Swiss-Prot record:
Gene Ontology cellular component annotations, sorted alphabetically: cytoplasm
Principal place of residence: cytoplasm
Protein name as it appears in the record: Adenosine 5'-phosphosulfate reductase
Species the sequence originates in: Mycolicibacterium smegmatis (strain ATCC 700084 / mc(2)155) (Mycobacterium smegmatis)
Pathway in which the depicted protein is active: Sulfur metabolism; hydrogen sulfide biosynthesis; sulfite from sulfate
Protein family membership: Belongs to the PAPS reductase family. CysH subfamily.
Binding site for [4Fe-4S] cluster: C122, C123, C205, C208
Length: 236
């Protein structure tokens, strides 16, 4: 295994390019094994705690793997409960990342309900900036985004260089369909956020998440009525 902690950006970019070419048709398990082989303990798995599919798979490859959760201060109670259950059930180390300011401090400084007045700035302060800081300690991050989730994710690669955060990005289940997800959940008894079964196929912060209309893409319930469709973490 290459010591990625001393690798240059160009070397990591080249590694991502080689991986993308060699694993174009790889399974999720193969992608996770490739990640572990090349990055050892220097990668993190990001989870929004909608379900624990990726967490469970990663824990089988590397027990005790770091699992990053962005605790924005605006999550549903069910999401926080799922985070706590994930930490209790799976062999992982949950890294709970919080913004610089609490919601109360942000309200005092910028006014209440910034999420309604300027959702882009709210996401930047409570998601993008904290994630940027948290990822500085890693050479790669693994995410659970899937191509079927929204048009903005339709071309999500399996492995790439993430220009926004300056590290390698692996999306092991990018090619999975909703049926693939449900089959894996059923076959392995995976923890799922109870809100999923209440009609929320995409779960973010409570003030900015609603149930999508039938037939709409799963993320249409996020920032409903606004042109905003992504929080800034997954820039295509």
């Amino acid at each position: 295994m290459t010591d990625v902690t001393t690798s240059t950006e160009n070397e990591l970019r080249e590694l991502a390019e080689r991986g993308a070419a060699e694993l174009a048709d790889a399974s999720a398990e193969e992608l996770l094994r490739w990640t572990d082989e090349h990055f050892g303990g220097n990668y993190v798995v990001a989870s929004n705690m909608q379900d624990a599919v990726l967490v469970e798979m990663a824990a089988k490859v590397r027990p005790g793997v770091d699992v990053l959760f962005l605790d924005t201060g605006y999550h549903f109670a069910e999401t926080i409960g799922t985070r706590d259950a994930v930490e209790a059930v799976y062999d992982v180390h949950v890294v709970n990342v919080t913004p610089e300011r609490t919601v109360a401090e942000q309200d005092e400084l910028l006014g209440k309900n910034l999420f309604a007045r300027d959702p882009g700035e709210c996401c930047r302060l409570r998601k993008v900036v904290p994630l940027t800081n948290a990822l500085k300690g890693y050479s790669a991050w693994v995410t659970g985004i899937r191509r079927v989730e929204a048009p903005t994710r339709a071309n999500a690669p399996l492995i790439s260089w993430d220009n926004a955060f300056g590290l390698v990005k692996i999306n092991p289940i990018a090619a999975w369909t909703d049926e693939d997800m449900q089959n894996y959940i059923d076959a392995n008894g995976i923890l799922v956020n109870p809100l999923v079964y209440e009609g929320y196929p995409s779960i973010g912060c409570a003030p900015c998440t609603s149930k999508p209309i039938p037939g709409a893409d799963p993320r249409s319930g996020r920032w409903a009525g606004l042109s905003k469709t992504e929080c800034g973490l997954h820039v295509s």
